[in-house]
Amino acid sequence: MGSALDTLKEFNPKPMKGQGSKKARIIIVQENPFDYEYRKKKYMTGKAGKLLKFGLAEVGIDPDEDVYYTSIVKYPTPENRLPTPDEIKESMDYMWAEIEVIDPDIIIPTGNLSLKFLTKMTAITKVRGKLYEIEGRKFFPMIHPNTVLKQPKYQDFFIKDLEILASLLEGKTPKNVLAFTKERRYCDTFEDAIDEIKRYLELPAGSRVVIDLETVKTNPFIEKVTMKKTTLEAYPMSQQPKIVGIGLSDRSGYGCAIPLYHRENLMKGNQIGTIVKFLRKLLEREDLEFIAHNGKFDIRWLRASLDIYLDISIWDTMLIHIIDYRGERYSWSKRLAWLETDMGGYDDALDGEKPKGEDEGNYDLIPWDILKVYLADDCDVTFRLSEKYIPLVEENEEKKWLWENIMVPGYYTLLDIEMDGIHVDREWLEVLRVSYEKEISRLEDKMREFPEGVAMEREMRDKWKERVMIGNIKSANRTPEQQDKFKKYKKYDPSKGGDKINFGSTKQLGELLFERMGLETVIFTDKGAPSTNDDSLKFMGSQSDFVKVLMEFRKANHLYNNFVSKLSLMIDPDNIVHPSYNIHGTVTGRLSSNEPNAQQFPRKVNTPTLFQYNFEIKKMFNSRFGDGGVIVQFDYSQLELRILVCYYSRPYTIDLYRSGADLHKAVASDAFGVAIEEVSKDQRTASKKIQFGIVYQESARGLSEDLRAEGITMSEDECEIFIKKYFKRFPKVSKWIRDTKKHVKDISTVKTLTGATRNLPDIDSIDQSKANEAERQAVNTPIQGTGSDCTLMSLILINQWLRESGLRSRICITVHDSIVLDCPKDEVLEVAKKVKHIMENLGEYNEFYKFLGDVPILSEMEIGRNYGDAFEATIEDIEEHGVDGFIEMKEKEKLEKDMKEFTKIIEDGGSIPDYARIYWENIS
């Protein structure tokens, strides 16, 4: 029987042995030598080696005398693939012998495989930077310098790990690390808890106090959370949303943990109530400075669960870190603990206890003895971070302006919007549930009718029958082929649905689409296989009717899973849902949201024969004021394109906007060589898509595919010609893009007009695809980030005005560049006028926003009985017709339009889908 290494030896017969001093204190182990290392007969050569050796020297480690370099497998692999497990296993005896001879103080695995086979640990990015003692040997995993060059986001961790390594060799605390003697207090008794809170109550004015909560999942508004059946039976009280514990700290090195409603808390109910009263007294002290990490989460829970209002501005170390470094770096405390403190890995014990699956996020299920240690440590880490981060804001005027004018007011504005929430029509939600389940089933049945699918399922059934026959043979009497089939064909068990195609399986879809149907795509996975993702389906849409049905199925499934079935679990007893909005959610500065993800609410469709038109998701959101209220939406018009003008300041474009001309038509007229009045709907859509595509730095190929998905045929070459004509008409845009890309290559950062910085370390990546993506982000971020800050400032000003004016209207949703309000009908005109004025004239309300200059900013209004049935309107429309009159007029126009379309379908011999027939019969 041959060796697993024979194939490698065939091309490179000589093993590449380790190199370095036999008295080295460190062994650095990689999986195997790269081709270029093997050719030069030297480990850690090239850029990666230079980076490592320079870094070692910088921290005082001699890269020649102190280090021995080696690999587990001593041969390069074809195309630099990772070694196979068999190749590594066969090499391990030599590896251990090498370690015995050198006898180093520390062994450094630099990849996931070397980590696994040396230590039995996995996930090097998670365990790196920490010393582990295993069977008498010390291991210190680090990320390979080649990975750092490809993904510069790991550079900070790499530098930090080298500093820690040097300190370990010297027996000292690493430099630039916030290290303190750890002092902890776990208040497991009523007396200890009261004593600790009283100590904080006696702190002098101006003292800083960290707060942190651990909770049952993330939503404090609902009555019950979802849990696994077995867990629920064991811990029924853990289904109730509650604060299970609170942590506090008033100095670095210190942390305390107090149990509140944790299932293991033995205190009596009245004692917990007394603790809450003392906490309220502490947290509502206006002369203290409170600190938190992702504090909006804590404040939201305190308000909703304990009716404690922590309304003074708090220092949020996560937000400060985002101001200082909005980029690909991690801003969660456990990551920052590695970078800034000596407490990296403080959450390791918790990781092993975290509930999974349906119980994920339910910290009531974690034993208190483990949770309290994590909670106190979390507070300590946050206080240490605050001592480094708060001065970053206080001592920098630009960051201070961002903090005081956007971050903190935005933080509390979003909190108000979350607390108010948006009303849900439960009856319509139930209609959606029944209808979507029926439609998904219909589409699935339709896909199974295609002959290739029929044949595939027949083969699956036949394989199961063959397995049953093999099962009747005693295992000892089966041939190797039969035994192999018996194992493989287990997956075709009909009792588990194995005899039917799973249309959610990429593997089965790949077989069906590419092997059986013979479809072709230009989109591939990272492993080189043809992709079944949405972009690939769009590309293949014209090749097969099956793909069109599959796309419908995927869309219906997505909407059902994300907005129909899940949303019913997020509604509070008053039929309100409370999305959580995150300033830190995206690296460009745009808001993100969850529970539900408002940013993914589907756009309206305008074709009455489509399923989504008849069962509109957004229609479930209506006014909390019942028949006396309406939903009013204000949307910035072409905000990002207008902000682009702020960067290149071309009077012609400003005049075009001022005149009220249609920019998309004007650009289309020039690009397609037709008079502006002759520009078709498809040409305008193409113009709009391509202009926004330029902002997002989309390629001509990508734009062509996007347009094809819209039913518009424009080849890659035609899109390229359009782009060139656009830049010819707007040369300053082209120059600004070139200058921005050049600038980011010099300093690796870009800024928005509001001064927010985004770091783009991947611009220096040796992986060209990552460097190219960083270039694209360098162009997109200033525009999208500035636009997001304009919307956020509008939210701040509108929310402030509504509350100060005593009106009942409230902001209920914000999505990208739009602001949605829930208004009593008698407030609509007053609110509409003010909201529109604020959105279009930010510079009048905050002088900093005068950077918008002469560029006209426009907002457009929609109004309706619910979020889905909203109609475009002007203030003049409402003044002329009244709220009810205008909506009734638009509803009538909509019905007439739909009736004409249905009538035409019937006259042309077509048929109306079953799901639309009830609607047709009602309007006819």
From Swiss-Prot:
Catalytic activity: DNA(n) + a 2'-deoxyribonucleoside 5'-triphosphate = DNA(n+1) + diphosphate
CDD domains: UDG-F4_TTUDGA_SPO1dp_like
Disulfide bonds: none
GO molecular function, one term: DNA-directed DNA polymerase activity
Nucleotidyltransferase among keywords: yes
Domain of life according to the entry: Viruses
Pfam families (alphabetical): DNA_pol_A, DNA_pol_A_exo1, UDG
InterPro entries reported for this sequence: 3'-5'_exonuclease_dom, DNA-dir_DNA_pol_A_CS, DNA-dir_DNA_pol_A_palm_dom, DNA/RNA_pol_sf, DNA_polymerase_A, RNaseH-like_sf, RNaseH_sf, Uracil-DNA_glycosylase-like
Any single biological process term in GO: double-strand break repair
Alphabetically ordered keywords of this record: DNA replication, DNA-binding, DNA-directed DNA polymerase, Exonuclease, Hydrolase, Nuclease, Nucleotidyltransferase, Transferase, Viral DNA replication
Coiled coil found in the keyword field: no
EC number: 2.7.7.7, 3.1.11.-
Domain 3'-5' exonuclease span(s) in chain numbering: 235-386
PROSITE patterns: DNA_POLYMERASE_A
Family: Belongs to the DNA polymerase type-A family.
Known function: Replicates viral genomic DNA. This polymerase possesses two enzymatic activities: DNA synthesis (polymerase) and an exonucleolytic activity that degrades single-stranded DNA in the 3'-5' direction.
PANTHER family: DNA POLYMERASE I (PTHR10133), DNA POLYMERASE NU (PTHR10133:SF27)
Protein name: DNA polymerase
Lineage, opening ranks: Viruses, Duplodnaviria, Heunggongvirae, Uroviricota, Caudoviricetes
Gene this chain is encoded by: 31
